């Protein structure tokens, strides 16, 4: 019934969020399907997340229950093992998830050197930036103002390291977006209909 998801103009409509968590790698073993927030994955009967299939997203997962700890952004696609959804490779724990609301096609973000939106700043509009250094910005990122769109920031260039979900709003210091240090060196937009066949860190060209 794919036609249910098409308008007369042929443009895809946003789908209800849907993600399937499997206990084993490569989509094997016991599984559980989610269509809304899940504060504790173990309460669904899934002891450990071994692989993830996102049928409609995007989603954000967390290392700890109740949306705490390291963050992992999932877009529509297949994540056959834990290291396909984390590039920090610090933990294989995935304990809670929630859908990400994507309500804007336009994207604008301002990153500031110091807390409370002070110091040097870099403004990004409708673009992904794999390296702040290449754009001449070598400062730390201590506060962020997301004026439109939904973004994910990364600790290192090339979309590597810890991930930080940046939804519309103000983040007065790095702790507000979950960063242990004011270090963000790349950022990209989250768009509702993106497809990553092998997970967000192996985009097809």
From Swiss-Prot:
Ranges in coiled-coil conformation: none
Region of interest called Connecting peptide, as start-end residue ranges on this chain: 102-106
Positions of the UniProt region annotated as N-terminal arm: 2-16
Biological process terms in GO annotation: lens development in camera-type eye; visual perception
Keyword line: Acetylation, Eye lens protein, Repeat
GO MF terms held by the record: identical protein binding; structural constituent of eye lens
Modification N-acetylalanine occurs at: 2
PANTHER family: BETA-CRYSTALLIN B2, BETA/GAMMA CRYSTALLIN
Similarity comment: family membership: Belongs to the beta/gamma-crystallin family.
Name assigned to this protein: Beta-crystallin B2
Organism: Canis lupus familiaris
Organism taxonomic ancestry: Eukaryota, Metazoa, Chordata, Craniata, Vertebrata
